[in-house]
A protein has these predicted regions:
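Alpha-helical transmembrane segments and terminal signal-anchor/GPI-anchor hydrophobic tails
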Residues: 182-195, 202-284, 290-311
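Loop-centered beta-sheet repeat module
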Residues: 157-203
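Membrane-cytosol interface segments of multi-pass membrane proteins
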Residues: 1-169, 209-220, 269-272, 277-284, ...
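Amphipathic alpha-helical segments that form well-ordered structural scaffolds
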Residues: 142-146, 195-203, 259, 321-324
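Active-site environment of divalent metal-dependent phosphoester hydrolases
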Residues: 35-37, 99, 172, 202, ...
């Protein structure tokens, strides 16, 4: 009697999107909680920022669904920016205005303050990382429709992420390019996974499957990328360009998503719903947790895990309130 491993259903990427987003958000909070360099958990904690890559991959898949359903630019941009920008404006104002008044140094003039609130321009100009993921995502949205139309008409251009990977190398090692835009390494090194997500969108939409035997390849990919990333952070932290590790994050992201889907299939429904709830308010949680919750909790000098759990417990209700308030206000405006 032969035992066959069930095929891997790519549709689960869509089915468990909420849970995946929730897990990614928890990874990011784990990454932001401080930990001494000599701690044995330091390397694993440092790669929690792979949650950003998971966000971007899932965002790419979701954009493909949206575009193929209704390829209309006005509808596309309205849905995307009405979802992100109001929450961004509220939390950016809540951070940058008091910071400017109190001389915190993030905004040096009223013009600089306006730029930080509207488009977070100090990220683009000086690599100011307070809320970098949100302006980076909004920038990627600008280019997504053109890319999706391009690969629909000319599928060969699905290979463009390879060129994006080459660009990451150029921005690090070609001196004129590095001087011009090298400060945006954290953005450039995340661009490929976003467009890879778009590339995978059609396979997810068509509910394609992978041979069950491929699970062994996925596990090898996961372990190689995970363990090498942990080693780099635990042993070589600060001794290598970060884009190199983020190249490892690409296979780590894809393999993690596929393995997490198998986990979510087996978890009790209440736990899936709880993790999915975190995913549903992940935008707001990202904006709130670090600057408005975590930095105050860390003053209590608690150990790592109590700090993490207290941060989560405080952040989630605040994120839900922001999400509900913004959603209701936007619904009224758009009627």
């Amino acid at each position: 009697m032969s035992w066959k491993i069930p095929d891997i259903e790519l549709a689960n990427i869509s089915k468990y999107r909420g849970e995946l987003m929730g897990a990614a958000m928890l990874f990011i909070i784990l990454f932001h909680v401080g930990l001494p360099r000599e701690d044995l958990f330091f390397g694993l904690r440092r790669i929690g920022n792979v949650g950003v890559d998971i966000f971007l991959f899932l965002s790419g898949v979701g954009l493909w669904f949206s575009w193929t359903k209704r390829p209309d630019l006005q509808h596309f941009f309205a849905n995307r920016y009405w979802r992100v920008y109001p929450a961004w404006l509220i939390m950016a104002s809540a951070f940058y205005i008091p910071d400017y008044i109190n001389g915190g140094g993030h905004s040096t003039s009223l013009v600089d303050l306006a730029g930080d609130i509207l488009i977070n321009w100090d990220f683009w100009l000086h690599d100011e990382l307070t809320f970098w993921y949100i302006p980076a995502t909004m920038m990627l949205y600008l280019f997504a429709p053109a890319y999706m139309q391009l690969i629909i008409r000319h599928p060969v251009y699905r290979w463009l992420p390879v060129i994006m990977l080459m660009w990451c190398i150029l921005t690090q090692y070609v001196t004129p390019i590095h001087h011009a835009v090298g400060h945006l390494e954290i953005f450039w090194s995340r661009v490929p996974i976003f467009f890879i997500g778009i590339n995978c969108g059609e396979m997810v939409r068509r509910k394609q499957t992978m041979d069950g035997a491929s699970i062994w390849m996925i596990i090898v990919m996961f372990l190689m990328s995970l363990l090498s990333s942990i080693f780099l952070e635990q042993v070589k932290h600060g001794e290598f360009p970060l884009f190199l590790e983020r190249m490892l994050y690409i296979p780590l992201t894809v393999s993690s998503i596929l393995l997490l889907n198998r986990l979510f299939r087996r978890l009790p429904s209440w736990l899936n719903k709880a993790i999915s709830f975190v995913g549903g308010v992940s935008l707001e949680a990202y904006l709130i947790h670090s600057q408005f919750v975590l930095k105050y909790i860390e003053r209590w000098n608690l150990s790592y895990w109590p700090t993490f759990f207290i941060c989560v417990v405080i952040t989630l209700p605040l994120a839900w309130l922001l999400h509900e308030g913004v959603t209701r206000a936007v619904d009224k405006i758009r009627r």
